[in-house]
Amino acid sequence: MKKTIAIALSLAFMFNVNTLPGNTCAFGSNPYWTYTLHPDFPMDKYAAGQLGILKNTYARSYLMAAYRYLNNKPLTTDEQKGFEQLWDQRLQATSSDCAGNTESWIKLRATVPGVSKIETIDTERPVSKENSYESYCNAQTSAFETAAKTLKSMIEKYGIGSAQVKEWVAAQDEVFSNCGSPRYSDKVPEAKIPKPLPESADATCKQERAYQIAAANFYAQNFDTARRDFEAIAADANSKWKEMAGYLATRSMIRQATLAKETNKNLLEQAGQKIQHLIANPSYATLKEDLQSLANFIAVRISPDAHLNKLATEKFDQQTIEEITKTLDNYLDPDNSATEVTYSKVPENLKKNEMIDWILTFQATDEASTKHALARWKETKSTAWLVAAITGVDAEDQHANQLIAAARADKSPYAKWTLFYHIIRLESGQSKDASVKASLDKVLSAPPAELPAGALNSLKLMRLPLSANLDEFLKYGIQKPLAICSDGGVPEMPDEEDDLKGKGKTPPTFTTLAGNVLTNKFPLSVLRQVATNKQVPANLRNNVAWTSWVRAVLVGDEAEAKNLAAIASPLNKAKSKFFTSYLAATTPEDRKFAAALLMLHFSSAEPNAASGQLMDDDYGDSSGWWWGASPVRKITTSNSDDDSDSSSDDEPFDPLFLTSAQRAQATTQLAKLAKVETAPNYFAKIVLAYAQKHPADPRVPEALHYAIKCTRYGATDDATTKLSKQMFVTLHSKYKGNVWTKQTPYWY
């Protein structure tokens, strides 16, 4: 009960309870080589001090733990558990607690004979008539658990088919009917309040009904009435609900105060005074933690500065950690817009506490935060402020070399990899390539056991631009992702449970940055070398051979196209017969048609080597759908921060090992590729021209079918529909009764 009430409270006053922390994006599986919002899984190692490379994009609870270690005050075992419990709770939540247990309640309710059938219960209600577009969770899991527990006790006392049980269920239906209402409407729902039972009714039934009436008014936003009713129940010494009613009377005041257009601080202060009286009352001992949570909730809104300073001096248990981060979030981002921290706008009172000041300085990205971090480091010479300062400066900063020297001299085992990373970052910006390469190679040649996998991937990525040859590029450009994350609920949450244990089996892939270099810097001759390099896993060689062959065809390099076809064919049996036909073609016209037919069969055909997971090789929701009006593309991912480690915004770099001739080849090939039409139009023109010259070729109807299909699924423009219709007319006029004609009822 204590846990569920506390969790319910933390969510009940968030107007849009479906908003999750962080920046969610459209569903889609992406590889993560490092995380940007949290440390590596499992997080017990981070809680124990293996901080890896700290990022200022981490949630504040992770930075709270880091602050302690950076000040050489390791977390106790109990404190570590408190952090781990909070992180697990937050990351496992794929949605709010709202309506989390309605199904169990509905199922139990259905066992009562003669009750009407219900399918769902709406538990979210608009804030007000004027603010119908924002909603809050009106009834949480604990409400349905309490109802289920009460129903079971009623059945045990009166019998499942008794009038008392049926009347109680009917009244409870009215209670829960007030929880939701029509969305995006200014219509105020009509409250359904159970009627009081007659004086002659059973005493237990009357107590239950009194509680139901108060709860119904609470859910219906009749807060004055609900408070009065709950206070009356609290005064009834014989009611089993007296303590819970006293608690809910204060919640009625809080909800009334916070759902108002402007928060009613006077009413909150009154509620706070009542809560303190209840906390001091021994009868409320079982609800003490929940009452304290209410007191904290009020303190955040009445005197957040004092509340934060008090919390920051307490022992770090789960509740304290959560309360600090929640208070900071509400203070700095009251409308839940998730904007970046701007230190110059942080209230001065927040800066008085050293830990909070450090966290906000480290997270902020403005000039004021960097100046403050430098000033505090010069004053304290502490590791924590050194980390904040070196994170904020760039290579041209006048303090860069001083910070690099201090970072080299720092002996903190907890800051080691963060400081190492920023030394490399700053020296890379100063073009000290030899020093950077030597430092990285020393670590990467024998990675220490305490170096987290995500941090190791970041260091490999920094080494990538310094590759002296193709083998080095492949060594550092192919990495094992920490996980594949769909980002459909909690951001950066692995899809597979094994990844949460650090035992994921996701195969190595090209990183985003490496994929961009392959696509935008390598000529076909070097891409062919990648496709035949045994250092590269077979699935990645298949990827490169396939996409590079597509590119060779599109730019008209028949020699490379033939070479790549011979390489790609044995790597993918599904394409082998098409490649055989392509290689057997005796004229350029025939080869072009055979190539088009092959690409039409596999919508993953595009002229860009992919990073991350491979595209599907057939039609499907995750296929590449060929190419669009701009065939050359730069890859971006939801985890783009990974590749900003060594190159801003995933921008591809010029590999050191490419010759001037190879660079020129790549430039020429990319220029030709940029002129290629969008795929549906490209295929349509080839197929129509071939059909006109070779109408008897048995492959023509099949090609027309797939080319028309491409005009439905591919990237189209104003010319596509005319071409689609032209192919449709050709197919239906010249190949009547053909199996492919029958499968093509429309043009697009």
Feature-to-residue mapping (PLM):
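Gram-negative bacterial Sec-dependent N-terminal signal peptides
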Residues: 2-20
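Extracytoplasmic/secretory-pathway proteins
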Residues: 21-231, 237, 241-248, 253-748
